[in-house]
Amino acid sequence: LAGVGLFAIGALALAGCTSGGGNNGDGGDAGAANPDAIITTNGCEPENPLIPTNTNEVGGGKILDEIFAGLVYYDAKGAPQNDMAESITVDDAQNLTVKLKKGQKFTDGTEVQAHNFIEAWNYGAKLSNKQLNSYFFEDIEGFSYDADTELTGLKEVDDYTFTIALNKPASDFALRLGYSAFYPLPDAAFEDMDAFGQNPIGNGPYKIASDDAWQHNVQISL
């Protein structure tokens, strides 16, 4: 695969590189992060457009994990911690209730709501969409490898709450919800998914820098 450069611009890019104490030990200020700093890292050209349910390799995954956020993220010990989710209640090994934090936004300014997860997962699971990560949804009621179907196990309760019904007990299902296949998609994605994959709108700490930020086989700027 061709090598590409990944550029991240802004204070968040330095968050992992600066001291958490804010003091240099002699009473002076250690200095604030530079919001105009540019961090450059090596990567490889994504094999596919940047759609979470169709990305299963490192080149694209590395970028998706910066521009999207899921229901949970995994801490340094690999344990899930709530991100977009306010709470995930496992009613039993086959039924879950997800409540979202209010006020979370995509970079186009629209709010992240329950339907953004439901529609994204249905898109990923639909046979005719031929998504590489469709198997992530196989435990949800309504999933089929043989025909286009709706994930009937996903029900919107209100703008910030939805339920998940599984077709069989899966005690570890809640632990999987930080995987990129489970990221939400904004309404705009469904207007033109091909175009969206070239310039995705996410809900994570970074966004694609401009319409032409992805220079294929060269670099991508966030």
Residue ranges, per PLM feature:
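Bacterial lipoprotein signal-peptidase II cleavage site
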Residues: C17-D29
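N-terminal lobe/hinge region of extracytoplasmic solute-binding protein
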Residues: N42-D92, I201
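Surface-exposed binding/hinge segments that line
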Residues: T89, S134-D187
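Aromatic- and charge-enriched surface segment that lines or borders ligand/interaction sites
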Residues: E86-L132, T163
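Gly/Pro-rich hinge or "lid" segments in bacterial periplasmic/extracellular proteins
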Residues: A170-L222
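Short, well-ordered beta-strand elements
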Residues: N34-E45, N95-V98, F117-A120, F162-I164, ...
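N-terminal export and membrane-targeting signals
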Residues: L1-A8
